[in-house]
Amino acid sequence: MNKFALVFVPFPILGHLKSTAEMAKLLVEQETRLSISIIILPLLSGDDVSASAYISALSAASNDRLHYEVISDGDQPTVGLHVDNHIPMVKRTVAKLVDDYSRRPDSPRLAGLVVDMFCISVIDVANEVSVPCYLFYTSNVGILALGLHIQMLFDKKEYSVSETDFEDSEVVLDVPSLTCPYPVKCLPYGLATKEWLPMYLNQGRRFREMKGILVNTFAELEPYALESLHSSGDTPRAYPVGPLLHLENHVDGSKDEKGSDILRWLDEQPPKSVVFLCFGSIGGFNEEQAREMAIALERSGHRFLWSLRRASRDIDKELPGEFKNLEEILPEGFFDRTKDKGKVIGWAPQVAVLAKPAIGGFVTHCGWNSILESLWFGVPIAPWPLYAEQKFNAFVMVEELGLAVKIRKYWRGDQLVGTATVIVTAEEIERGIRCLMEQDSDVRNRVKEMSKKCHMALKDGGSSQSALKLFIQDVTKYIA
């Protein structure tokens, strides 16, 4: 067969861009006849400067088989409209690529579009140019299956959203992709509120139009959920091709002096002695919660590295920032009493930190990329979900898979939609940290074994390599 090409359209935030780029690299390494173009939409307003730097680095590394089409800035609407407003530019870019392919006798043939889970309106572009459309799902199979299940129940009139607060509900759901009953109070806001549910229902319906779904997971991590999805008979084939992690140039973390100081300090600590607390680019806390965390860390007696940021007042307009004076916020004398045991920082080079032998546990917001990074480096986690699907991730990691330590079972609020969270007490946090840092716990041993499987999945003959090959085979079947 002759050369063929895929066009990727990722959602324009850093985490999604990174996993898309990593998957594209794996695909072109796997198949020499394949070339990939990645269309990069204007970044969402408020995304940090590191995303711009990352895109610049990608563009500079473009070549004949993997290159990037960066769409220049336009208006910055709300998140929900961002992709839709740029559809005309996506159409023009795809048309240009098709035209470029047709002009060269040795050029590849367009075999399909691969769109992000939040770029489903691009399906219409694929239909217009008469090529298949594939989905790239940047989170896990479990939450994918949950969303599809709820969409199916809703369309059968077997699911509705109550006017009462779902976080107070005692109802549990029987979800085919889970072995454990799933509490309604653990639902992501998008699947449990009248404001957001229509968007996710539409998303689920359009997912079913895809020729296939690439998922950033690996078969050994979610075997039950994958089998459930495959056996349902009414969803496209899922290809578990992860973990898709951007580790290159990050494991040393020495891009600036601050990062270097952090890593040098970690090099001086005993193995598995430091608990690392970090909550992603959107995670932040108010003063009261920060004090409870400080009390817990001091009482636990463990060494710590704490990435602490002030919660954003309006996440649509600004990301979390730094506290002006931590000594006024945290308990009196905290820094003097813990100066030999811990560090409180702002930004943290997360991948480089997790790679250090000194890290013995990770308190995380439970974003999917962070979970995969912790598994890659064999670091057990204690979930502290803050927004989006993270409550589901926390439930699965603790209750379903036994790969995480519980701080508390139920969490309230969502920082993305601005709903109030409940203060987690110092006692709860301290108890969670002590369990997390146990050196021979069942959770730590399970994480160690899963880490080995995580690495094996990406090697020749591994499950994710096999899934990539199967995806490429299926793509070539649909080339007209």
UniProtKB/Swiss-Prot annotation:
EC number: 2.4.1.-
Keywords associated with the record: Glycosyltransferase, Transferase
Transferase listed as a keyword: yes
InterPro entries: UDP-glycosyltransf_plant, UDP_glucos_trans, UDP_glycos_trans_CS
UniProt binding sites for UDP-alpha-D-glucose: 281, 348-350, 365-373, 387-390
Keyword Ribonucleoprotein annotated: no
GO terms, molecular function: quercetin 3-O-glucosyltransferase activity; quercetin 4'-O-glucosyltransferase activity
Family: Belongs to the UDP-glycosyltransferase family.
Protein's recorded name: UDP-glycosyltransferase 71B8
Organism name: Arabidopsis thaliana
